[in-house]
Amino acid sequence: MHRFDFLNRANAEYVDHLYELYLRDPRSLDETWQAYFAGFEDAGTREAGSGLSTTAPMTIGVQNLIHSYRELGHFVASLDPLGHDRPSHPLLDLRQFGMSEAELDLNVGKADFYGPTDGTLRDLLAKLQATYCRTIGVEYMTIADKAQREWLAQRMEPILNKPAFSTEESRALLFQLIAAEEFEHFLIRVWGGSSKKTFSLEGAESIIPLLNSVVDDGAGMGIEEICMGMAHRGRLSVLAHVLNKPYEVIFSEFEESILPDPSTGGGDGDVKYHLGYANDRPAKKRSIHISLSPNPSHLELVNPVVEGIVRAKQNYRNDKEQNRIVPLLVHGDAAFTGQGIVFETLNLSELRGWRTGGTIHLIINNQIGFTTPPEQGRFTPYPTDVAKMIQAPIFHVNGDDPEACVHAARLATAFREQFKCDVMLDVWCYRRRGHNEQDIAPFTQPVMYAQIEKHPTTTDIYARKLVAEGKITQAGVDEMRKVARERMAKARELAREKRPRQRTAALNPLWKDFLVTPAEWNPKTAVSRNVLNEVAEGATRVPPDFTPHPKLAKILTERQAAVKTGRGIDWGNGEMLALGSLLLEGTPVRLVGQDVQRGTFSHRHAVLNDFNTGRQYVPLANLKKDQPPIAILNSMLSEEAVLGFEYGFSSADPRNLVMWEAQFGDFVNGAQAIIDQFIAAAESKWRLMNGLVMLLPHGYEGQGPEHSYAYLDRFLALCAADNMQVCQPSTPAQYFHLLRRQIRRTFRKPLILMMPKYLLRLSDSFSRIEDFTDNSLSLVLDDPTIPDRDSVKRVLFCSGKVYYTLAAKREKENVKGVAIVRVEQLYPFPKKEIQGILARYRQAREIAWVQDEPRNRGAWHFMEDHLRGLLPDPAVLTYFGRDAAASPATGLNNTHKNEEELLVGHALELPHKETREAIDAQSKIVMEKSAPEKIAEKNGQEIKLAPKEVKEPAEKAGAVAVQGQNRAKD
């Protein structure tokens, strides 16, 4: 027989392991387990002697009984408002602890139970069930920190998890429920027939007093600001009853009569249940600021954004203890389980560069996801099980017990403030209506909704309870309802008479000077040579007791020498000068991404590691005393949550330069939802600017389809209304000016940078000191090698690495009459600059766009639309690049080289080695293959040139497309 068979079988092996540790060294265990095993051994000694004692085994059984109820009591708690009883748990049977019902009246004491008992097993069992098996079930015994476990037990067990509520508190709680219920009824009554969705909170009204408890009790604990994120379910009620958004403003949004904020201009706007809001509201005799971030319908996507906002605010408000600004996230049960970004965001919670001191999570567990029941959406008992990975305490609460919800909220808030850890509130409730007000839920859940239809509302249940307790009369309840209805009716009249105005600026006062976009996009960004020397000296200096890697020491020396001589300033050096100069000017810097401290391509080396000890040193953080902070952080291996966090960080404080770098640009599509919903569209939807910089390594070098391409075409397709900038710098100095421009302007736009890989070590791309001190950003770089512009017959526009490939080939082949122009900023499209370039080449009859990417990718379609209208007569527009392809790039290096040779050969040689008649002949041969192309030729719309003969199979030759296009007539 196993020596611990009288324990829970599930725990026997674990206890056996602890016992082995006890035998080696009793002090290695905490006091509870020491006493446990001491009693066990004492019992064994007496059993071997003259008499048998039942006291020691009983004591051990009692201790394990208490432990098991703490660990497993939630499994039999009454959590479901719809009354689906949970069966008794076999591991809580008395026989598991070596006891029986015949011993219920024995005096067993209470071991380490903190609650009051009369000493009998019966009373202890009743108190354990009252604490852990009523309408609150708690999961906290998996927490490794003993202090956290004891703190929770000491606050739950003495009051049996059921604090007393005064008459005043109970009435206030009831009125919150009534206001929430009547609000939903009012919206349905007035607008329910107009197909306007509200995503009602009905069935989960208890979250209103729960959230207000977090706010009020948090204020009493010293919390100054709560930053919230939540989806659509119940959002309007939370705005009205937690953030105190005026009813008349919400009603005006239903009527679509609300006036826009004049400080933010136009925009497309968004549906009312996506909009954000911020307000200062009274709480515990003081004011607390609450903000609710705007969010899309993409569930849980706002989570890392809110965390980034909180971290930025904690930084600039010097909340080092992270106890004054708190994140609060409201989730749905199905989404919390189903969306991977939840896991990613939880993983960020304890990482040094991203932790916010703990998030209060509230799950509106209405036991359904649109039409999907829990058993089809997860395999775990609870939606919160994913949170066990961060050892967060989890409070499961019955939503029909609003007092239990408030009590759990108080515990959760206090725990977060005490231990700076995440905490979970899982409110079991139901959804009285369908997914939206037009949805017919009984189509898919007929049994559930038959039960819901008969079930009284939470408000009615609680009102009857208070009436029975004598805390209020039925007339008092009716009066509360009357007051709530009158307030809403009055607010609707006010909304009709006086159109309220949106308050976008209230979301963050730091943006008050950045809300209007000025006409000037390109301020001065040059820096004096003295400043550059100061940066170079400081950023290459290490302490006397620090030993860098020998090769790194050489790199640092070369960087400083390049700045001093003014020649050969490479990309890592140019970035260092940009960041250092901004730091000296007072701009905080944050650079985040996978492997950014060294750089994926070993080009940055911004964080140095001592060769002997591994100690880290950041030269840019030590340029001078009292400089602003710089954080250069290797992120976890995730794109979506990390990018969302950095977006949130940048949105909270426009004074920071915030940069996120992808390991390769190809992986950026792992964060596509953040890009689509926030980076590209937030200004238009919610009038929120953002200055985030995205660094996306991009370039075709034969490395295959996942290491070549940063989805340039997708970013350009998202561009409209000056919503962001898309650039591809071709020199370190251009990169330098782009970063500085991002901060020097008086407005903020996201900056998407296609960054080089091959060019990082290409000396032809390096910059001179004059490029930093005498110039600012050039949106377009003209060809510096053309002495006689009238001799140019063809102008090749391009962007990025392909410029250097073309230039090297042109020089090698001594090609004349071809100018190569770099477009550094693709969007906003530099129309004026390109018009100026075209005016210089008056004799050019062919204007071309050249790109590495396939025809259906890259910038071709974007540039085609913009260049066509700028062509002078009789010039034609031509495309040189790879043909359309399903995959971004070939995985075969030889194929890549052949494609590149063919592409460059066409772009540089065809106009000079073949006559126009020969070109036309080739185009006819191609077009003869399909009737539509012949028609296109007759209509003057499209001409395709066959590739030059190469030593490749026909299908290889076809991998490069050369297309001419006549200028469209106005």
Where are these regions (language model features)?
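Conserved phosphate-handling catalytic cores of large alpha/beta enzymes
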Residues: G369-T380, K388-M424, W428-G434
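Active-site pocket-lining segments that scaffold enzyme catalytic pockets across diverse folds
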Residues: L187-E248, K554-A561, I569-L583, T587-P588
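Long, low-complexity, intrinsically disordered segments
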Residues: E937-D970
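Flexible, glycine-rich loop/tail regions that form catalytic "lids" or insertion modules at the edges
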Residues: P57-H67, H74-L106, E181, P246, ...
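Active-site cores of enzymes that catalyze phosphoryl transfer or operate on phosphate-rich substrates
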Residues: K162-A180, E184-L187, E256-E307, R311-N318, ...
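Cofactor-binding active-site loop characterized by glycine-rich and histidine/acidic residues
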Residues: E224-Q391, F395, F601-D653
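Extended, charge-enriched "interface" segments that sit outside catalytic cores
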Residues: F40-S206, I223
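Subset of Sec-pathway N-terminal targeting signals
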Residues: M1-F40
